[in-house]
Swiss-Prot record:
The lineage of its organism: Eukaryota, Metazoa, Ecdysozoa, Nematoda, Chromadorea. Its main location: mitochondrion. Gene3D superfamilies: Acyl-CoA dehydrogenase/oxidase, N-terminal domain (1.10.540.10), Butyryl-CoA Dehydrogenase, subunit A, domain 2 (2.40.110.10), Butyryl-CoA Dehydrogenase, subunit A, domain 3 (1.20.140.10). It is an enzyme of class 1 (oxidoreductase). This enzyme is specific for acyl chain lengths of 4 to 16. Pfam families: Acyl-CoA_dh_1, Acyl-CoA_dh_M, Acyl-CoA_dh_N. This is Probable medium-chain specific acyl-CoA dehydrogenase 10, mitochondrial. Homotetramer. Belongs to the acyl-CoA dehydrogenase family. GO terms for cellular component: cytoplasm; mitochondrial matrix; mitochondrion. Expressed in the epidermis and intestine. Substrate binds at residues 157, 268-271, 392. Residues 1-15 form a transit peptide.
Amino acid sequence: MLSRIATSSLGLSRSATGVIATQSRQISFDLSETQKEIQDAALKFSKDVLVPNAAKFDESGEFPWEIVRQAHSLGLMNPQIPEKYGGPGMTTLETALIVEALSYGCTGIQLGIMGPSLAIAPVYISGNEEQKKKYLGALAAEPIIASYCVTEPGAGSDVNGVKTKCEKKGDEYIINGSKAWITGGGHAKWFFVLARSDPNPKTPAGKAFTAFIVDGDTPGITRGKKEKNMGQRCSDTRVITFEDVRVPAENVLGAPGAGFKVAMEAFDMTRPGVAAGALGLSWRCLDESAKYALERKAFGTVIANHQAVQFMLADMAVNLELARLITYKSANDVDNKVRSSYNASIAKCFAADTANQAATNAVQIFGGNGFNSEYPVEKLMRDAKIYQIYEGTSQIQRIVISRMLLGHFAQNGTSRI
């Protein structure tokens, strides 16, 4: 009946409806065999290596170098670097699968392994061939770290508030300023740096900043002390100070003055990966909670038989599955060259909120034990919070989503994007 309606009412020929039917059959929510193999390999590594070591590195705060090296040798570090630069050449979706699996074991160790992704993105998007060969090639060849330097003590969500400045002198730029909360900052071999190149405060952000690749051994760079954070404690986070740091003009990413665009475009590429990290944590929360609920007894039966616990588990499962769908969709958008800040922001926002609620429920299901460091969910709750903060707070994501939604509705008369 529907085919007759489509043919007559919409004026479609039978050949056209046949094409539509064929295209609809191509929609699949199943991973390919290759993707399943990648996911299985990453999850095995996560359960065999990350899970047994998570508490140790959380307590010591040491950077997990040995695990990082193992991950690199298995092709699980920086998997999105193209083959032409020596990398595995995996898709954004495949990279998200790896992040999700590693985060199941420990989001802090995962960040140690995959932290360079945010620095990689602007080079991949805006770098010239020489820059890609040199800097992406180095990351593919060795288990080294690169860092994204944009956030400052007075400029987090407000990127336009960046005070680090650069001044062109001959064939060089001189950079001065400080960056804060820089992931991997203590070990980075190179930095992506955003600096104000136009001192006029009235200049639009799109023309006021220039982006650079800065080698980590350049004179004038000072790495501050490692920060003691609430969660993801083995991830190295520091203040990085640039004092009269001379950078050759050939290290400008994109065009001079176009740094803001370079920095922002990176987020559409990396936010699916951040969302995937939150997915892995939510997944672990659900597994730990289900296992505990089937073992712990109260009122003469396992607590899994109590409706209050069942409802918490059900809510965790519902949100996890929905977060997984939008995260995979946003990753697929990147792979299909569809720039969608809308889907990327929804994925990052919803997955982050889901992780925090999952961790809260997990601690509640564990009761007093959940508040104790002898059990894994206490760490999961501490690790979850940062997902609502870094790479764009959940509030910033909601601003992005609402602006795009309203703009689309004004043009098209529908909220469906």
